[in-house]
Amino acid sequence: MPVITLPDGSQRHYDHAVSPMDVALDIGPGLAKACIAGRVNGELVDACDLIENDAQLAIITAKDEEGLEIIRHSCAHLLGHAIKQLWPHTKMAIGPVIDNGFYYDVDLDRTLTQEDVEALEKRMHELAEKNYDVIKKKVSWHEARETFVKRGESYKVSILDENIAHDDQPGLYFHEEYVDMCRGPHVPNMRFCHHFKLMKTAGAYWRGDSNNKMLQRIYGTAWADKKALNAYLQRLEEAAKRDHRKIGKQLDLYHMQEEAPGMVFWHNDGWTIFRELEVFVRTKLKEYQYQEVKGPFMMDRVLWEKTGHWENYKDAMFTTSSENREYCIKPMNCPGHVQIFNQGLKSYRDLPLRMAEFGSCHRNEPSGSLHGLMRVRGFTQDDAHIFCTEEQIRDEVNGCIRLVYDMYSTFGFEKIVVKLSTRPEKRIGSDEMWDRAEADLAVALEENNIPFEYQLGEGAFYGPKIEFTLYDCLDRAWQCGTVQLDFSLPSRLSASYVGEDNERKVPVMIHRAILGSMERFIGILTEEFAGFFPTWLAPVQVVIMNITDSQSEYVNELTQKLSNAGIRVKADLRNEKIGFKIREHTLRRVPYMLVCGDKEVESGKVAVRTRRGKDLGSMDVNEVIEKLQQEIRSRSLKQLEE
């Protein structure tokens, strides 16, 4: 009979099989009331599942991350319950958990309107407030199939036929008259599912295949309590204000249009930000001793067949042909960098060789996934590739890590989560090689005092990798940086160097990305700063304004003086009230506004205001220039007097 060991090391002995709920009741009524599920020997199970042998048990509550995921998953079933009551002929497809919520794909003979979604949410609340028990039943594959055939649930039948073994026992979850199929676990009672909101609808092909029927996807969010739900909705509201697409239009940074889906038309001010970001990256490349190269954006398909990209990636590649040859527009820079490395004999003395490129890449992303600057088809990668010996891996990874943190800190990103992905089951190379490579990555992180977590088995078949995920001011995660070891591509493309023993050897290749893509990172920065770019990045850093025409000559002189000092400056000599001009340039997020009246002309000074509405008073022009140059040169995140 089972001995149950709890997280604090205490044990409970039973003379019969028990469920997590039984153990929770044994500990106390408060824990039983909070019990959502259990973790038995590391595996999540329903609160009602029986434990027949000795086991480690943790009771899962709404305070646990797993508990919140279970609540969200059960809310997806609640959505199914409600939609079948409102529109009984709906066919249910899949309803998984996603970040911050859930969705359900449904086949419905009507297009859902906003009023429909509101009615659906209302019915969900009515059902949840009944606090009914969710009943789990394990059945045979045949019984599950018969259940869904009788109910006309063709998508569930398809899942059983194509994804579930005939000797398996699927879990059926009964919500009163509604039944759904799932691995679980789910909440034992709907009292846990009171704090949710339906967010939006979208189209989605069954199984993600455009040859299949288009379904309607209903998105929702769910939380453990009302406070958490409201906080999330407030974050969404703030995120909407910061939407880079909205700000990009307000500030005239760029636009997209139907004739070039997923391609960016950079306007002058947006391109200024792009170029300043390039200058910053180039400064760091020089500091960390990288070469900068430029490869062709299109190469013969034969090369992509050699690399393996054609076999595994061809659906995402744009192609064209000329003179009976097929060409691929590059989706990434690495094969081109190997071609550059292969020019001329290389010695171990030439390594490490660090090769960077602002590579113009294209990927045939599905049109439905395109999203402003965040998901595009044409983008500029800031990646680099380091060719080195196995002995140099640790030092080179160390340098990559320092560069990542050096660059992220410039933009004020402090919360960075790091994950180390290790060898998958299918891989190339010996265990000894993987042992050393994984150890090199781990030691490099440890030497930099960087906490990290392992993602076991999540590495690529050709090498382990480190992923850097930064969190913005709204605590949203953006996976940008990677350091990926590659033991395959150099060999596939016949890269070699002459070692100390005068024998030819294959170099290790380190793929290194920091920003990810210039376009996406500018989108991230636009939302992080809400368009209030630090002065060094701002397209226009200073606007000088006159009050009347009598100061026009003085304004023009100052404009030229600041421009000669390397400051991006504009003069506003329009015959408008000064308050109107200030408001307009404040809305344009111009960091500094210099106002010139008769008093300033006489004294040779300027009245300085910031875009945040702070009046810095009258200042000497040379002093203003000197302080602005220092702020720009240091790439400060703060303005004067902040």
Swiss-Prot record:
GO BP term, example: threonyl-tRNA aminoacylation
Cofactor: Zn(2+)
Keywords attached to this entry: Acetylation, Aminoacyl-tRNA synthetase, ATP-binding, Cytoplasm, Ligase, Metal-binding, Nucleotide-binding, Protein biosynthesis, RNA-binding, tRNA-binding, Zinc
GO cellular component, one term: cytosol
N6-acetyllysine: residues carrying this PTM: K286
This enzyme's EC code(s): 6.1.1.3
Region (Catalytic): 243-534
Residue positions binding Zn(2+): C334, H385, H511
Domain of life: Bacteria
Keyword rRNA processing: no
Domain called TGS: residue spans: 1-61
Gene3D superfamilies tied to this protein: 3.10.20.30, 3.30.54.20, Anticodon-binding domain (3.40.50.800), Bira Bifunctional Protein, Domain 2 (3.30.930.10), Threonyl-trna Synthetase, Chain A, domain 2 (3.30.980.10)
Chief location: cytoplasm
GO molecular function: ATP binding; metal ion binding; threonine-tRNA ligase activity; tRNA binding
Catalytic reaction list: tRNA(Thr) + L-threonine + ATP = L-threonyl-tRNA(Thr) + AMP + diphosphate + H(+)
Pfam family, one: HGTP_anticodon
Family: Belongs to the class-II aminoacyl-tRNA synthetase family.
Subunit and partners: Homodimer.
PANTHER family referenced in this protein's UniProt entry, alphabetically: THREONINE--TRNA LIGASE, CHLOROPLASTIC_MITOCHONDRIAL 2 (PTHR11451:SF44), THREONINE-TRNA LIGASE (PTHR11451)
Role, per record: Catalyzes the attachment of threonine to tRNA(Thr) in a two-step reaction: L-threonine is first activated by ATP to form Thr-AMP and then transferred to the acceptor end of tRNA(Thr). Also edits incorrectly charged L-seryl-tRNA(Thr).
Protein name (record): Threonine--tRNA ligase
Species of origin: Escherichia fergusonii (strain ATCC 35469 / DSM 13698 / CCUG 18766 / IAM 14443 / JCM 21226 / LMG 7866 / NBRC 102419 / NCTC 12128 / CDC 0568-73)
